[in-house]
Amino acid sequence: MRRRGHVHLALRRIAAALACVFAVASTTAADAPKHEIQDPHYGDTLFHFFQDHYFTSITTLMVSEHFDRVPHHADEAEVLRGGMLLSYGMQREAGEIFAQLIERGASPAVRDRAWFYLAKIRYQRGYLDEADAALAQVENHLPPALEEERGLLQANLLMARADYAGAAAALAAMPGKTPGARYVRYNLGIALIRAGDSARGSAVLDALGQEKAENEEFRSLRDRANVALGFEALTENQPKAARGYLERVRLKSLHANKALLGFGWAAAALKEPKLALVPWLELAQRDVGDSAALEAR
C-alpha cells in the first residue's frame, strides 16, 4: 500500500511535467511548430495517462511502439515510458531508455529530460558523482515542473554530501509560488535543521504542518512535516512539543507508524508509561516489515 502511494505521487509529477509541455506548446508564437498529436495511438496513451490509468497507459504505449504506431512521437513516447518505468521502481530499464535517447541525438527538449531522469536514477541508487555529472548536462529546455524538480534534486545531492547550508541556500532561492513549492519548503526546513538552525527549520515545517491540504499528496507531505517536527523536538528534549506535533499526523497515513513510535517515546519521556503503551501496542499489531513497528515490539 505504501509503495503504491509513492508510485502514484511520482506519476502525478510526470503528469504535471507533461501538462507543462503541452501548455508551453499551446502558447508559442504562431510561426513556431505546434505540439499536436499526430499519431492517434499516442493520443490514446496520453488519454489513459491523464485519467490516472497508468498501467493501461504503459501497456498501450508498449504495444503501440512494438507495432510502430507512434512514429511522429517516438522520442516523446520513450521519455514517457521511461518516466513511468522509473516511477514503478524499474531503474535499470528506465536508465537504458534515457541513455539510448541521448546516444541517438534526440531533440534538446527530449535530451534535457533524459539527462534529468538519468540524474534522478543515479541519485536514487547512491551514485552521487554520476548524478551530478548527468545534472550538469541539463541545459534550459526542461518544462517548468521538471525545472523545479531539478532544483530539488540539486538540493538533495547537496544534502547527501552533508552540505546542508548549501542546500538551504539553494532551496531558499527557489520560487515560492509554484506547484511544487511545498516540497521546496519541506526540504528547506529539513536542510535548516540539519545545518544547525533548528528554530528556523522547525518554523518552516510547523507552518507547512498546519496548512490546509486539498489532496492526498499534500496531506501526506503535511504528515511528513509533522513527523519530522516531532522527532526534532524529541532530539531537543522537548517531549511535550513533540507530542503536539505528532498528534497532527493521521492514523491511516503513510507516516502513521513513525508518528506512533515517536508519540510513545514522548509519553515515556514525560513519565507517562501507560500512555506510551497505547501507540506501541497499536504498532505491534501493524506491518512487521515496517521499521517503526519492529522497534515497538
Where in this protein do the model-derived segments appear?
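Acidic, polar-rich low-complexity tracts and alpha-helical solenoid repeat scaffolds
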Residues: R2-H8, T27-R297
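Bacterial N-terminal signal peptides
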Residues: R13-A25
